[in-house]
Amino acid sequence: MSDYSAHFLIRGKDVSQHAADYLSGLLGTYRRKNLECIHGDIPESNYQALQQFVSDSPWSQDKLMIQVAGEVNGILGGKPHSALLIDESCFVKKGDHSVGVQRQFCGRLGKKENCQRGVLACLGLGEKASLVDFRLFLPEWWAQSPERCEKAQIPREQRQHRSKLELALDMVKTAQARGLQFSWVLADSAYGCSNEFCADVEKLGLYYMMDASMKACVWDADPRPSLPAPSAKRGRPHTVW
């Protein structure tokens, strides 16, 4: 954590230990990852300070991820087969207060469940990959409820519904803007079946390799339309009106 402690210096106060405790709790033995379980797993942590850190501490997630992405790029980026991997993940929840939670399909469980959904971007090379960006999906009915968004403390500029395809494309553009070096974008059929998404990736000067539906029709060569050969038979006689 020492390499990232500068991100947790808030108004002259160092809260990096709370960040370390929270991270240790997320990686801990308890299945549930609420603050009570995290505090139980990390008994030396300060519960009240940990709650303050998670709820109100104004450290910048974006600045932290920029540093993480830059370090990952130095290891996995800039190679001929460096690729940006797009995928989704679900986080099962019990209540209805977590940002973006609703009953929706959870790919991890293969069924509908009360959960959050996120779109993730990883920089990969061969068998190695590391997270460089992520977006939390905000369902439309959440975006249409200012009171719910206010209660959940969602920043005003993020209180809009965007499709997962839009979130993914935004992360591809952000990765390029941050200087990450990759030539390929990889994703599953949720993205590969969108002609618009594939075309937008190609417009960014990138190659893509994505899963497609079993029913998808593709050309194995550039199709060239041609005129049909003229028929030897004479057409229908003209009709006089």
Residues covered by each model-derived region:
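Basic, short loop/linker segments at the boundary and entry of helix-turn-helix/winged-helix-like folds
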Residues: M1-A20, E147, K151, P155
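Electropositive nucleic-acid engagement tracts
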Residues: H7-Y22, L26, Y30-D96, F197, ...
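Short, charged/polar micro-motifs that form catalytic or ligand-binding hotspots
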Residues: S24-G28, G40, G107-K111, Q158-H161, ...
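Electropositive, glycine- and tryptophan-enriched low-complexity nucleic-acid-binding patches
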Residues: Q48-F53, R108-F182
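Active-site-proximal, Lys/Arg-enriched surface segment
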Residues: S55-L138, E150
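Solvent-exposed, flexible loop/coil residues
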Residues: F105, L109, E140-W142, N195, ...
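An internal, acidic/charged active-site-proximal segment
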Residues: E147-W241
